[in-house]
Amino acid sequence: MNYLEIAGALIGLLYLWFEYRASIWLWPVSVIMPAIYIVVYYQVGLYADSVISIYYLLAGIYGWWMWLRHTPDKGEKPVSGTPSKLLLPMFVVLLVVFVLIGIILETCTDSTVPWWDSFTTALSIIAMWMLAHKYVEQWLAWLVVDAVSCGIYVYKDLYFTSFLYGLYAVIACFGYLKWKQLMNLSYERV
């Protein structure tokens, strides 16, 4: 039994609760959880997931800073939709990162799932950036990442983590609806 994996999964549930509520407390938790998963993923040969956990840790610091930089007179950064002008650049970044990581994993590692690992990693980079900017569609990106990751983790015998990501996928649906509601409320106040 991997106690580190269990600890990471439990902290992940706490993270999810804070994210669902659009609470700034998701950010400190988002620094702790990936620190644990760097080790867990490396142990089972999910190298891109291990590296993406380093990114998550750094993105957690960035997201925390982004959410904190709004002054009390301006209020908290509101939830908003992703500007359409960002969709093409985000897609290009997704494709480039996906191909680069996939090639590296296929040629330089013993990964048994290089392209799946690469896909979830590339999309996670985009989703985490969207979360830092409080774009509601980040939930849709996470839904795809979580569903694919759930299957990968079952394949890799990471059952607690697979359960966590299955739960993430379900809650991503509810999170999207909740954030849409928050976005609509902030538009009504304007």
Predicted regions and their residues:
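Short, flexible micro-motifs
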Residues: 15, 48, 63-66, 160
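Individual alpha-helical transmembrane segments in multi-pass integral membrane proteins
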Residues: 7, 49-58, 165
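Helix-loop junctions on the outward
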Residues: 22-25, 37-52
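Membrane-water interface of transmembrane alpha-helices
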Residues: 55-72
